[in-house]
Amino acid sequence: QFTDVKCTVTKQCWPVCKKMFGRPNGKCMNGKCRCYS
């Protein structure tokens, strides 16, 4: 799942993915967080 959350490093996305989708799996791609379910 793509989000509109800006990021510079992957670890910034883990709490975002955890909060939005219930799992912390994800990474920073093209300056935005992308989450995996």
UniProtKB/Swiss-Prot annotation:
<keyword id="KW-1015">Disulfide bond</keyword>
<keyword id="KW-0873">Pyrrolidone carboxylic acid</keyword>
<keyword id="KW-1220">Voltage-gated potassium channel impairing toxin</keyword>
<keyword id="KW-0800">Toxin</keyword>
<feature type="site" description="Aromatic residue of the functional dyad">
    <location>
        <position position="36"/>
    </location>
</feature>
<dbReference type="InterPro" id="IPR036574">
    <property type="entry name" value="Scorpion_toxin-like_sf"/>
</dbReference>
<feature type="modified residue" description="Pyrrolidone carboxylic acid">
    <location>
        <position position="1"/>
    </location>
</feature>
<comment type="similarity">
    <text>Belongs to the short scorpion toxin superfamily. Potassium channel inhibitor family. Alpha-KTx 01 subfamily.</text>
</comment>
<comment type="function">
    <text>Inhibits voltage-gated potassium channel rKv1.1/KCNA1 (IC(50)=130-135 nM), rKv1.2/KCNA2 (IC(50)=3.1 nM), hKv1.3/KCNA3 (IC(50)=78 nM), and rKv1.6/KCNA6 (IC(50)=910 nM). Its activity (tested on Kv1.2) is not voltage-dependent.</text>
</comment>
<feature type="disulfide bond">
    <location>
        <begin position="13"/>
        <end position="33"/>
    </location>
</feature>
<dbReference type="GO" id="GO:0008200">
    <property type="term" value="F:ion channel inhibitor activity"/>
</dbReference>
<keyword id="KW-0872">Ion channel impairing toxin</keyword>
<feature type="disulfide bond">
    <location>
        <begin position="7"/>
        <end position="28"/>
    </location>
</feature>
<dbReference type="GO" id="GO:0015459">
    <property type="term" value="F:potassium channel regulator activity"/>
</dbReference>
<dbReference type="GO" id="GO:0005576">
    <property type="term" value="C:extracellular region"/>
</dbReference>
<keyword id="KW-0964">Secreted</keyword>
<keyword id="KW-0632">Potassium channel impairing toxin</keyword>
<dbReference type="GO" id="GO:0090729">
    <property type="term" value="F:toxin activity"/>
</dbReference>
<feature type="site" description="Basic residue of the functional dyad">
    <location>
        <position position="27"/>
    </location>
</feature>
<feature type="disulfide bond">
    <location>
        <begin position="17"/>
        <end position="35"/>
    </location>
</feature>
<dbReference type="Pfam" id="PF00451">
    <property type="entry name" value="Toxin_2"/>
</dbReference>
<protein>
    <recommendedName>
        <fullName>Potassium channel toxin alpha-KTx 1.17</fullName>
    </recommendedName>
</protein>
<dbReference type="InterPro" id="IPR001947">
    <property type="entry name" value="Scorpion_toxinS_K_inh"/>
</dbReference>
